[in-house]
Amino acid sequence: MKFIDEALIRVEAGDGGNGCVSFRREKYIPKGGPDGGDGGDGGDVYLVADENLNTLIDYRFEKRFAAGRGENGRSAGCTGHRGNDITLRVPVGTRAIDNDTKEVLGDLTKHGAKMLVAKGGYHGLGNTRFKSSVNRAPRQKTNGTPGEKRDLQLELMLLADVGMLGLPNAGKSTFIRAVSAAKPKVADYPFTTLVPSLGVVRVDENHSFVVADIPGLIEGAAEGAGLGVRFLKHLERCRVLIHLVDIAPIDESDPAENISIIESELFQYSEALADKPRWLVFNKIDTMSDEEAHERAQAITERLGWDDDYYLISAVTGKNVQPLCRDIMDFIEANPRHEVEQTADEAEVKFKWDDYHQAQLADHQFEDEDEDWDDWSEEDEEGVETIYKP
């Protein structure tokens, strides 16, 4: 299945149903009075996270999603049916952004998380709501309000504990194949990895973490060179970044300069991402002796002014890979993910007399009615209700 991590869709909530103007007409019940019902509220549009999805391909071709309109009110005080809600399933890790205002509406980071993205319109009021001591036969009603309509930008950001960084052919995919059951493509040419991939690293029976591999970065990626930096967003939720470096590049490039290139691209993309904990891991030490590998790594770190620890591994042979994984696991357990609790403020429950409808009622000024307040006539048929429409 094709990996799609961005989609632009239009969501339209349902309009509210209109109120009804109706009077009760029944023999032997003089002056039956108003009985027009309220309309129904418009349907809402929700996003819900589904762990069984891993791409936004469902929204590549189908772009418009509309909830149901609320039914109009009816006679006999019948309220219109509420419009049907619609729920759009998206992968866990999806972020919703208003495409016009660029406002981030929220992130869906847990399976089953649900988010309202378009609110349905309010229902209109029937003429029963306008009955008073001085207006016993009201012919007023209100119409329902339009539902929200918005262009929504969906962005999928993978949820992983560890993110892999490095130039093309640094050995990132080989490392993931060595430590997990994931089998990303490995070849001897740049940009073998074209889309992000995830692997689960199981340190022992009770401990595991998720590692994300993204396409390699090159100099100028922030300006769009290579595959650009569009996949760097998948590392924003990682707790630690593993910067994998080819200690002896086949093109004889300088490893210290290669490290500086990645650091520069990170800062140009996001300072927050650049400030994440980053571990330096030198790969492909199987191509030289242990003594030469240590000498090269020490010379590179001294040139960079790197004061933290670093690792020497061979992803092909598996040398020193398990100790690295255990250290990563210890770091993850010592630094649990701090999730912002998105607790929605409990809105005050208001049934029909909410602020909108109070304002609608206040807009109508009534005059004293005459004695023939309900327009009753002996010619009216038995059991017939009169409904007035504008």
UniProtKB/Swiss-Prot annotation:
Residues 1-159 form the Obg domain. GO terms for cellular component: cytoplasm. Keywords: Cytoplasm, GTP-binding, Hydrolase, Magnesium, Metal-binding, Nucleotide-binding. Its main location: cytoplasm. Pfam families: GTP1_OBG, MMR_HSR1. GTP binds at residues 166-173, 191-195, 213-216, 283-286, 314-316. Residues 160-333 form the OBG-type G domain. GO terms for molecular function: GTP binding; GTPase activity; magnesium ion binding. Residues 366-384 have a biased composition (Acidic residues). GO terms for biological process: ribosome biogenesis. An essential GTPase which binds GTP, GDP and possibly (p)ppGpp with moderate affinity, with high nucleotide exchange rates and a fairly low GTP hydrolysis rate. Plays a role in control of the cell cycle, stress response, ribosome biogenesis and in those bacteria that undergo differentiation, in morphogenesis control. Monomer. Belongs to the TRAFAC class OBG-HflX-like GTPase superfamily. OBG GTPase family. This is GTPase Obg. It comes from Pasteurella multocida (strain Pm70). The gene is obg.
